[in-house]
């Protein structure tokens, strides 16, 4: 499982750029795993083990990108709420 170390060390992540940077490596790793699984299927497209590995890689990729999207949306909503309270 990917390590979201920026969120577990008790450090403050106060801006959207820091959040995006923290999530970049797990997203890149998941993307690479999907691409590697697809490349492995080119030689043996009917291998059940390789198909299962691709399914797992795609599921992991999907979860990581959903987490990324949710966090970015939450940060946007938080910042928008703060800005709306200013006169």
UniProtKB/Swiss-Prot annotation:
Effect of substituting residue 82 to A/C: Shows no Yop secretion in the presence or absence of calcium
Effect upon mutating residue 17 to C: Shows no Yop secretion in the presence or absence of calcium
BP-aspect Gene Ontology terms: protein secretion by the type III secretion system
Impact upon substituting residue 28 to A: Exhibits constitutive Yop secretion in the presence or absence of calcium. Requires high levels of calcium to block Yop secretion. Can assemble needle polymers on its surface
Mutation effect (residue 77 to A/C): Shows no Yop secretion in the presence or absence of calcium
Disruption phenotype: Deletion mutant shows no secretion of Yops in the presence or absence of calcium. Deletion mutant has no detectable level of YopN secretion, YscF expression or YscEFG assembly, but it expresses normal levels of another Ysc component, YscJ/SctJ.
Effect of residue 16 to A: Shows drastically reduced NF-kappa-B/AP-1 activation
Stored Pfam families: T3SS_needle_F
Localization: Secreted; Cell surface
Top-level taxon of origin: Bacteria
UniProt KW keywords: Plasmid, Protein transport, Secreted, Transport, Virulence
Substitution effect: residue 34 to A: Shows no Yop secretion in the presence or absence of calcium
GO cellular component term, pick one: cell surface
Regulation: The secretion and/or polymerization may be controlled by the type III secretion system regulator YopR. Interaction with YscE-YscG chaperone prevents premature polymerization of YscF/SctF in the bacterial cytosol and is required for its stability and efficient secretion. Interaction with the needle adapter protein YscI/SctI is required for YscF/SctF secretion, needle assembly and Yop secretion.
Keyword Transport: yes
Effect recorded for residue 28 to C: Exhibits constitutive Yop secretion in the presence or absence of calcium
InterPro entries per the UniProt record, alphabetical: T3SS_needle-like, T3SS_needle-like_sf, T3SS_needle_YscF
Impact after mutating residue 13 to C: Exhibits constitutive Yop secretion in the presence or absence of calcium
UniProt xrefs under NCBIfam families: III_needle
Role noted for this protein: Component of the type III secretion system (T3SS), also called injectisome, which is used to inject bacterial effector proteins into eukaryotic host cells. YscF/SctF forms the external needle filament that protrudes from the bacterial surface. Essential for the calcium-dependent regulation of T3SS and Yop secretion. Required to block Yop secretion in the presence of extracellular calcium. May be the extracellular T3SS component that senses extracellular calcium and/or participates in transmitting the calcium signal to the cytoplasmic compartment where the block in secretion is initiated.
Family: Belongs to the SctF family.
Note: The YscF/SctF protein can provide a protective immune response against lethal plague challenge during subcutaneous plague infection.
Protein's name in the database: Type 3 secretion system needle filament protein
Native source organism of the sequence: Yersinia pestis
